[in-house]
């Protein structure tokens, strides 16, 4: 099988962008077994409840659901096992120091293949309060409304 070029998205954690304020993002490799890779190539994964935990000088991805490979035998993996993340030592140290602050956590944002290798985009994030979520939604709606009025004015000028 030839190596794929570019980025092929497998799963995205849209709820993380809604529930958290993203402060910093990192790209990390994943240590996977063979059946996990085959299952991911079928595009089956869920990042919904996932989180990253730092243990010593290692980063681990917890609670990410990669279903068992349908053609797998007794060598199949468990669906919600913890998976090791491959990051540089400097990045792990930076994440460890920043995640110790109150209200900060590390969440997965996206799972994808980049040049044939499985990668996960993780983010240092701060939890949003309910009023912050409403404020973000209001700003998004205001931006859309402004774009609509501008496009309507441009349409009238062309006619």
Curated annotation (Swiss-Prot):
Residues 131-159 are annotated as: Disordered. This is SsrA-binding protein. One of its GO terms (cellular component) is cytosol. Keywords: Cytoplasm, RNA-binding. One of its GO terms (biological process) is trans-translation. Residues 131-148 have a biased composition (Basic and acidic residues). Gene3D superfamilies: 2.40.280.10. HAMAP family: SmpB (MF_00023). Required for rescue of stalled ribosomes mediated by trans-translation. Binds to transfer-messenger RNA (tmRNA), required for stable association of tmRNA with ribosomes. tmRNA and SmpB together mimic tRNA shape, replacing the anticodon stem-loop with SmpB. tmRNA is encoded by the ssrA gene; the 2 termini fold to resemble tRNA(Ala) and it encodes a 'tag peptide', a short internal open reading frame. During trans-translation Ala-aminoacylated tmRNA acts like a tRNA, entering the A-site of stalled ribosomes, displacing the stalled mRNA. It comes from the Bacteria. PROSITE patterns: SSRP (PS01317). It is found in: Cytoplasm. CDD domains: SmpB (cd09294). Belongs to the SmpB family. One of its GO terms (molecular function) is RNA binding.
């Amino acid at each position: 099988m030839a190596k794929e070029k570019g980025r092929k998205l497998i799963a995205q954690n849209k709820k993380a962008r809604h529930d958290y304020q993203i402060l910093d993002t990192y790209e990390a490799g994943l240590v996977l077994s063979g059946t996990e890779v085959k299952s991911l190539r079928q595009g089956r994964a869920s990042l919904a409840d996932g989180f990253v935990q730092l243990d010593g000088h290692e980063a681990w991805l917890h609670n990410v659901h990669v279903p068992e490979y349908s053609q797998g035998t007794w060598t199949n993996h468990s669906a919600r096992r913890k998976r090791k993340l491959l990051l540089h030592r400097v990045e792990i140290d930076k994440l460890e120091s920043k995640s110790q602050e109150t209200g900060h956590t590390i969440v997965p944002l996206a799972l994808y293949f980049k040049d044939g290798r499985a990668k996960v985009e993780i983010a240092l994030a701060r939890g949003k309060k309910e009023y912050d979520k409403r404020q973000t939604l209001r700003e998004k709606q205001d931006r859309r409304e402004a774009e609509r009025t501008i496009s309507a004015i441009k349409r009238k000028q062309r006619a």
